[in-house]
C-alpha cells in the first residue's frame, strides 16, 4: 500500500475445480504454487503472491505488467476466473471517490457488491444501494438497474474494499505436473497443437516428438514445429516442452518396399506410435479426429493402436469437427503458425488410394516383409535419448 492510502492494483485468480479436491486440495495448490513460482522466475516477475483457500492474489501490479500477467494466467492450468482490482482499506470516502472516477464518464451505472467478509456491517444489497445513493447525492451520477452503461463490481473482504477493473477467464483444469507425463505427436498441422494443449490443461507435463524426412523437411519446417511447441508450452513456462526431432528418412525408404501401397500410411503411423512409446511417458497424445482423413477411420485407428497394446493413447479431438478444432487453434494462438506451408511426413508418404479398412493380419504380414524396421526404430530412439 502506498502513502495516503493510494489504491494498490492486485490480480485475483480463483482456483476453480481445485477447491473441490477435498483432502487432496493442498497437494494441487502446492503444485500450483511451484508452477507460478517457476513462471514468475522465467518471466522476471517479482510481485508478491498470497495463496488463500480458494484463490491466489498477486500484489503490487503496475500498469505495464497487466498484459504480461494476463497472458500468463489466461493459460496457466488450475485457475478459472481472474480479476484485476483496485484495493483500498475500509475507507468509504476513498471508495466513493474511486467509484466516481470510474463511472463519471458514463451516462448511467449499476453497482454490484459481493461481501466475502460476512461480518461486515451491511449486507450486499444494502451496501450497493448505499453506494449508489451516495454517488447520486455527492456527484449527481445516475444509477440504473436495467441496462446500465457500466456495471461496477465491488468486493468486501475482511480488511479491504476491492473495485474490479477487469475480469478474464483462465483455462481451468489442473496444475501441470499433477497428472503425469505425456508425449505429444506434433505434426506441424492444426490439430496436434490443440490436442497437446487440452491434455496439458488436465495436469500433464507435455513434451513433443515430430518426424522429419529428407528432402521434404528443412530448417524452416523444424523451426515452425518448434514454434508450435513453444506456443503450447508458453515458451516452456507451463511445462518442460522438450521437442524430439526423429529423422524418419531411412524408415520411410524401408516402408516404401511394402507390396500393398494403400497400407503405407497405416504402417507409418504404427511406426510413429512404436517410436513414441519407447520414450516411456505415461501416455501419448495425438491430434486424430474420427474420419477426418483416411488413416483416422475406426478400423485404421484400431490397427494402429494395436502396435502399442500397453501404451495409453489420448485423442482429445476424436469427436470434434474441423471447424471446432480451428476455433480452438485460433484461441490458443497456434492457427496462423499451423497453416504456414510445409511438407509433413504423412503428406510426402501418402499413397494415391489409402486403405480405410485396414486388417491387422494384413498389416502384420506386410511388416514381416520389412527386415530393418525394428533396428532403425531402436537406433533412432537411442540416438535421441542420448542427445
UniProtKB/Swiss-Prot annotation:
Key words, A-Z: ATP-binding, Cytoplasm, Nucleotide-binding, RNA-binding, Thiamine biosynthesis, Transferase, tRNA-binding
The EC number(s) this enzyme carries: 2.8.1.4
Gene Ontology BP, a term: tRNA 4-thiouridine biosynthesis
Root EC class: transferase
Reactions performed catalytically: [ThiI sulfur-carrier protein]-S-sulfanyl-L-cysteine + a uridine in tRNA + 2 reduced [2Fe-2S]-[ferredoxin] + ATP + H(+) = [ThiI sulfur-carrier protein]-L-cysteine + a 4-thiouridine in tRNA + 2 oxidized [2Fe-2S]-[ferredoxin] + AMP + diphosphate; [ThiS sulfur-carrier protein]-C-terminal Gly-Gly-AMP + S-sulfanyl-L-cysteinyl-[cysteine desulfurase] + AH2 = [ThiS sulfur-carrier protein]-C-terminal-Gly-aminoethanethioate + L-cysteinyl-[cysteine desulfurase] + A + AMP + 2 H(+)
Record-linked PROSITE patterns: THUMP
SUPFAM superfamilies named among the record's database cross-references: Adenine nucleotide alpha hydrolases-like (SSF52402), THUMP domain-like (SSF143437)
Subcellular localization: Cytoplasm
Cysteines paired by S-S bonds: none
GO cellular component: cytosol
Pathway participation: Cofactor biosynthesis; thiamine diphosphate biosynthesis
Gene3D superfamilies noted in UniProt: 3.30.2130.30, HUPs
Keyword Oxidoreductase part of the UniProt annotation: no
Domain THUMP residue range list: 67-167
Pfam families: ThiI, ThiI_fer, THUMP
UniProt: ATP binding residues: 185-186, 210-211, 269, 287, 296
Molecular-function GO terms, alphabetical: ATP binding; CCA tRNA nucleotidyltransferase activity; tRNA binding; tRNA-uracil-4 sulfurtransferase activity
Entry function: Catalyzes the ATP-dependent transfer of a sulfur to tRNA to produce 4-thiouridine in position 8 of tRNAs, which functions as a near-UV photosensor. Also catalyzes the transfer of sulfur to the sulfur carrier protein ThiS, forming ThiS-thiocarboxylate. This is a step in the synthesis of thiazole, in the thiamine biosynthesis pathway. The sulfur is donated as persulfide by IscS.
Family: Belongs to the ThiI family.
Protein name (database record): Probable tRNA sulfurtransferase
